[in-house]
């Protein structure tokens, strides 16, 4: 296959999406069969917590864990035990350059992880490796497929390209999981003009995980890691539980800093549903990153007040789902990275009096705030 972009064709976005979560208690409906239990609509809600047409999952992104497990499960029974296996190759580093007719170069560097679910039980039970795809072969395949991509593609497209190859080329492979982290190389600008072949290393990383089953069933998750943001005002923390262990003072004026990790799932269940636009995934990644940043900071002149990291996190997640109907769910992890006020005193005098000006940065220990937001279909 010479052009990975040829994988995709036009189709409308599926509208049905009904994830499960730790705070949406469910049970199989009375009419559900064993086969039905893989479907979200085979379950009936017992308790649902709604947040403006979304459902909020706190602490654990259970819906993604369940969906991922359903997509990539290959369990068998051995001697009265349940056995599940997979094998793959991790941290395969590959860089690719594309050149256009105007002499502009385009560059990506990826770290690729591959995991195959396959029918190779004899390798474990009797030492028969005849059904094993060697991990060195997987590594080589990454470079072969990168060479075959004549046109510039996204990390998501390359992950789909690889996963589709493994599930179609090897009869014993039932599913492939491809995880890619893209190193943040950015084009250099000299005197305001983009350099044709010059790049510098940025900060936050573009991530993706793709699961492809032999049947063609698909799951795509994209994300961002290392998005460091900070504002020096318009943040506070009040009204929290106070007990004999509490020494933290309440405040309406503090610095707020975090390193955002976000992952979002697309609703596409098959290749035919993915938009054919070549730059679709890259543009959506940049759009979502911009939305997260804008919501965190607010307007350039006024900003926006944050009463807690939790409140800001929900606003950020909700704005992504409101703006982008092609995002089914989003998970955010936002540690509260502390800048502690500095007050220094000796026995006789105060050396430094804090006036919202001198801080001691520290990231250990730090607060840990994580939640996810998913679309639901209300039956009300």
Segments the model singles out, each with a brief description of its role:
Residues 20-22, 33, 53-54, 58:
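Short linear/disordered segments characteristic of secreted peptide precursors
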Residues 8, 69-290, 294-380:
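N-terminal intrinsically disordered, cationic/polar leader segments
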């Amino acid at each position: 296959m010479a052009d990975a972009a040829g994988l995709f064709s036009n189709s409308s976005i599926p509208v049905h999406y009904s994830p499960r979560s730790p705070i949406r208690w469910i049970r199989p409906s009375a009419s559900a069969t064993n086969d039905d239990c893989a479907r979200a609509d085979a379950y009936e809600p017992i308790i649902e917590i709604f947040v403006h047409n979304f459902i909020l999952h706190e602490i654990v992104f259970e819906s993604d864990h369940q969906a991922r497990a359903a997509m990539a499960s290959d369990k068998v029974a051995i001697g009265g035990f349940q056995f599940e296996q997979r094998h793959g190759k991790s941290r395969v580093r590959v860089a690719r350059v594309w050149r256009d007719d105007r002499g502009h170069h385009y560059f990506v560097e990826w770290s690729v992880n591959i995991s195959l679910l396959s029918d190779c039980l004899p390798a474990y039970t009797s030492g028969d490796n005849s059904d094993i795809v060697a991990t060195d072969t997987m590594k080589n395949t990454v470079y072969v497929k990168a060479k075959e991509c004549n046109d510039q593609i996204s990390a998501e497209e390359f992950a789909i390209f690889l996963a589709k190859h493994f599930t179609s080329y090897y009869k014993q492979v039932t599913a492939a999981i491809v995880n890619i982290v893209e190193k943040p190389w950015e084009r250099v600008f000299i005197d305001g003009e983009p350099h044709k072949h010059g790049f510098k290393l940025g900060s936050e990383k573009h991530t993706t995980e793709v699961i492809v089953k032999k049947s063609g069933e698909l799951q795509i998750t994209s994300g961002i890691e290392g998005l460091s943001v900070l504002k020096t005002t318009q943040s506070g923390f009040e009204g929290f539980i106070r007990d004999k262990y509490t020494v933290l003072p309440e405040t309406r004026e503090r610095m707020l800093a975090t390193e955002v990790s976000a992952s979002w799932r697309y609703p596409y269940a098959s290749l035919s549903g993915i938009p054919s636009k070549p730059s679709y995934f890259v543009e959506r990644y940049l759009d979502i990153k911009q939305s997260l940043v804008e919501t965190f900071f607010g307007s350039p002149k006024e900003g926006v007040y944050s009463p807690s990291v939790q409140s800001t996190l929900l606003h950020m997640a909700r704005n992504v789902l409101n703006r982008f109907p092609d995002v089914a769910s989003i998970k955010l992890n936002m540690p509260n990275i502390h800048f502690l006020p500095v007050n220094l005193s000796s026995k006789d005098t105060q050396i430094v009096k804090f006036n919202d000006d001198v801080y001691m940065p520290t990231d250990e220990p730090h607060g840990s705030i994580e939640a996810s937001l998913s679309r639901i279909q209300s039956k009300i």
